């Protein structure tokens, strides 16, 4: 009995530590990009996947201790996909006491009518979904729309655009919507997918499968995701370094004439960012930039037992 109790406390300790890290990551992203302001009404887009559940949970947690006041309303779009469990999200949200709205729109039928069998439906489905969510945000008086994309999604998008689109373009943590009326935020921008997965598993969220529509996985994105996971295993810290690079862009050392006035460089111009300082002349840190090794998960149990609740 005592052993089982210790195991439970150890698991609780690890969950608390994980939740604190996610809280810190989300809090830093909110502060860095001014995502949430006093009086904001945040529409939290809830799909039923691990990412959106985690986003809602962390935002609810931060709401209790934040120095500003903001409200949350969870929104799910029921696209009438066959097998969609309509009862799951309402039951979960009512149990939490969270304000919510289920929007019912048969986008599944529209997509099936417009897209030939066997073709990827994601693009059209995404456009339809965006339009409905923007309309819903207006109806609810939401000042911000929160999406559950995380750090890995942002990096994958960067590499997708480099490999297949020929441009350096990621996924912004904060942006103006394409209809020009709504501010979209991604509070999980600094969060690692593996942390989110562990948190979702520990919290036992009622996950709804994401492939109910029967559409094929985006194979290009899957290739990139597999590549990044392989790099993360073989070269610890590389993912952190690449994400850090997205926050430390040096336009004068790229080739985009829209970002830097190369034509304006003449004799007598000042040196910009080290001039022609080649990479092999710079001091390279022994540890990858932005990387912090995780704490040893096998610490002595007695160091863990007194911590049972996140404050």
Swiss-Prot record:
Chain ranges for the short sequence motif PP-loop motif as given in the UniProt record: 47-52
Top-level taxonomy: Bacteria, Pseudomonadati, Pseudomonadota, Gammaproteobacteria, Enterobacterales
Main localisation: cytoplasm
Gene: ttcA
Protein name per its UniProtKB record: tRNA-cytidine(32) 2-sulfurtransferase
Record-level Gene Ontology MF annotations: 4 iron, 4 sulfur cluster binding; ATP binding; magnesium ion binding; sulfurtransferase activity; tRNA binding
Family: Belongs to the TtcA family.
A single GO cellular-component term on record: cytoplasm
UniProt remark on cofactor binding: Binds 1 [4Fe-4S] cluster per subunit. The cluster is chelated by three Cys residues, the fourth Fe has a free coordination site that may bind a sulfur atom transferred from the persulfide of IscS.
Subcellular location: Cytoplasm
Pathway involvement of the protein, from the record: tRNA modification
């Amino acid at each position: 009995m005592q052993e089982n109790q210790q195991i439970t406390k150890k698991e609780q300790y690890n969950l608390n530590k994980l939740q604190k890290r996610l809280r810190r990551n989300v809090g830093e992203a909110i502060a860095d990009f001014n995502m949430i302001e006093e009086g904001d009404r945040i529409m939290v887009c809830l799909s039923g996947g691990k990412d959106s559940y985690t986003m809602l949970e962390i935002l609810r947690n931060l709401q209790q201790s934040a120095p500003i006041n903001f409200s949350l309303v969870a929104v799910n779009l029921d696209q009438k996909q066959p097998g969609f469990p309509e009862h799951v999200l309402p039951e979960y949200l009512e149990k939490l006491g969270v304000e919510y709205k289920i929007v019912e729109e048969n986008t599944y039928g529209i997509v099936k009518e417009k897209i030939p069998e066997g073709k990827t439906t994601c693009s059209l489905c995404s456009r339809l979904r965006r339009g409905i969510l923007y309309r819903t945000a207006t109806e609810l008086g939401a000042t911000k729309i929160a999406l559950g994309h995380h750090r890995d999604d942002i990096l994958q998008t960067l590499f997708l655009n480099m490999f297949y689109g020929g441009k350096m373009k990621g996924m912004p943590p904060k942006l103006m919507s394409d209809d020009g009326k709504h501010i979209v935020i991604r509070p999980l921008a600094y969060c690692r997918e593996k942390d989110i997965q562990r948190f979702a598993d520990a919290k036992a969220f009622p996950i709804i499968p994401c492939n109910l529509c029967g559409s094929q996985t985006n194979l290009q994105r899957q290739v990139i995701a597999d590549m990044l996971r392989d790099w993360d295993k073989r070269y610890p810290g590389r993912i952190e370094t690449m994400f850090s690079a997205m926050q430390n862009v040096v336009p004068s050392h790229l080739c985009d004439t829209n970002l830097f006035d190369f034509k304006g460089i003449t004799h007598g111009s000042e040196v910009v960012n080290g001039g022609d300082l080649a990479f092999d002349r710079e001091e390279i840190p022994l540890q990858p930039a932005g990387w912090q090794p995780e704490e040893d998960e096998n610490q002595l149990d007695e160091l863990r037992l007194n911590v049972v609740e996140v404050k």
